[in-house]
Structure formats: C-alpha cells, structure tokens
C-alpha cells in the first residue's frame, strides 16, 4: 500500500487556515515563504506531542515540519521510544524566524491572539492516548508553559536538535529517552529496547522521515539526508537558502548516485 499523509482533518485544516497574521512582525521571519504547521497524526491518536521552534527550508519544500537534518534527529529520538506512527510534531511559530532575530520574536508567543490560536491547536490535536510531551528548545518550552490546558502527562524540556551545545544536547536527550521509555507505549512496529544515545551523535541516531508523514509525490530521498551527511563536503540538508537572496530563494539539490 502506498503510504502518504493525506493532510489534516477538516476541522484542523479550518483552524490552521485561521492562523493569526504575522505581517506586523514580518521583518523577524522568512515571511514571504508562508506558514508550515505540522508532521504526524492530527486525529488525536498521538502518544507523544513534539513541539519545536519553527520550520526551515526543507520543511517549506515538504510542507511538513521537522523533515530536514533536525527533523531526522527528532525521528531518531522517536525511534528510540519505539514510535513509528503515534506522534505529532508542531512548532511554537508557524513561520520560520530569522536566526539573528530569534530573541526579538519571543514576545510574539505571548500575544493574546497568537497564544489563543496556538493553545486551541494543541488541544485539538491531542486526546486521551497522549502519554508525553517533548519541547525542543526555548520557544517550544515557552509555548507549553503558556498552554493552560496542557494534559497532565510527562513533559521533557530538551535542547533543540540544532543546538550548538553538543554536550548538553546529547546528555539531555539521553536522559529524556530514559524517562519517556517508562511511560510511552511503543507502536507495534517499533522497538524501545535498542541503544540510547552515546557520548555524541552518530548516523545511527538519525532516522529517515516516514513516507506516511509526507504528502503524496515527494521524492523517495526527501527526509533522508544520510548520503549528504556522509559525503565530502558534508551536506546536512538537500535544501538551503541562497546566500545571494536569503529572503526569497531556496536551493534544492537532488542527491547523486
């Protein structure tokens, strides 16, 4: 059977379409590329809710979040919990922020309209099956702290997968996996008894994005940058921003061979 993500249920799609305007803050974001909302299950069946900060270039191509190098690290994290399907990933912001302006964008999270829309989304996509929440990075942590109706489940607050503090990243992720394994029920096709993280990230700690998380018609290699990570020079993503036109041009390279 061909696996692909058919898109959000009608009620969730209607809510996503009502995302509050970012136009007043467009100088803080890659605004003209538009919003990107989710990856995974939106039918309230998720056992784990993952919240990151914002989407990146690869996510724009995929129209799904956490698909590039950072997303493949998160997928490896999910794999260590034995989750192959029962998860949902969203972001604190619907738009990608400019890295140099990330702290300036923090107050937007607390704007009443943004906070209300985000909290309603989170409450719409989780249900009684939820067993845990993971926040990846500062913005995600703030988003959960502002979620007044957050379910009473285990919440692990860890660094973003792109954190430059490699030691804290691997240490905190290792501890989170240990704790979450005590409460997250693995999927039937998953295994939570494999190795945890070691002293540093290795290729075995990554996992490709499942085809069932992506729209129909995506290339087979989108969401799996293992060849690029092992190439010289190393390419962690097939999609990157063009240095000559950072705001409006993406470069998408198909792997060779």
Which residues make up each language-model segment?
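A polyanion-binding, active-site-adjacent surface
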Residues: 1-180, 186-257
């Amino acid at each position: 059977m061909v696996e692909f993500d058919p898109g959000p249920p009608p009620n969730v799609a209607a809510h996503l379409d009502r995302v509050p305007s970012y136009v007043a803050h467009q100088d803080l974001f890659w605004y003209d590329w538009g919003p990107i909302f989710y990856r995974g299950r939106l039918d309230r069946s998720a056992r784990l809710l993952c919240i990151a900060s914002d989407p990146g270039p690869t996510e724009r191509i995929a129209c799904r979040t956490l698909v590039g190098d950072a997303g493949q690290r998160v997928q490896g994290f999910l794999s260590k919990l034995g989750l192959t399907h029962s998860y949902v990933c969203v972001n604190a912001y619907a738009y990608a922020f400019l890295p140099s302006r990330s702290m300036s964008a923090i107050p937007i999270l607390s704007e009443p309209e943004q906070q209300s829309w985000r909290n309603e989304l989170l409450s719409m996509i989780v249900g009684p099956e939820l067993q845990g929440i993971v926040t990846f990075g500062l913005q995600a942590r703030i988003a959960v702290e502002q979620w007044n109706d957050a379910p009473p489940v285990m919440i692990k607050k860890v660094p973003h997968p792109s954190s430059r503090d490699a030691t804290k990243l691997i240490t905190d992720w290792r501890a989170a996996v240990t704790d979450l394994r005590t409460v997250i029920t693995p999927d039937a096709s998953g295994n939570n008894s494999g190795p945890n993280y070691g002293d540093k990230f290795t290729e075995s700690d990554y996992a490709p994005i499942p085809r069932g998380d992506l729209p129909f018609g995506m290339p087979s290699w989108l969401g799996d940058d293992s060849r690029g990570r092992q190439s010289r020079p190393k390419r962690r993503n097939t999609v990157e921003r063009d240095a000559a036109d950072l705001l409006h041009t993406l470069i998408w390279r198909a792997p060779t061979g």
